[in-house]
Amino acid sequence: MNQSYFYLKMKEHKLKVPYTGKERRVRILLPKDYEKDTDRSYPVVYFHDGQNVFNSKESFIGHSWKIIPAIKRNPDISRMIVVAIDNDGMGRMNEYAAWKFQESPIPEQQFGGKGVEYAEFVMEVVKPFIKHKTGWCSCSTCKISKCK
């Protein structure tokens, strides 16, 4: 196994969600030697349901998606910055659905309708934060990469 593909540095942050006023955990997993390799550009991959991404103890079903082992087992995958955005627990379906469900499976409880707000949170809060913390740039020259 190619040891250079091991991901060792994870940073945890709390970002305020504008439409709820609550803080949300966002984790950034950086490739090994990220801070030493300043000339290299890295793509950024965003995962929703962030509780499920890294740790089985945090996953709602007791098993994580095992992103780190998957990357380690596949050395041909380019090194990348992995961003995991936690969901809102009981409000998960509201955030991931742009429209309200016509009929709720639970009487007197509405589902959906916050998808636009969640997308705005990702685009206007999370992505700029990731850019600031990692040096990632979305300009036409850099595309999905770290600016030089």
Regions of interest found by a model, annotated:
Residues 1-148:
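Non-catalytic cap/lid and distal C-terminal segments of serine-dependent acyl enzymes
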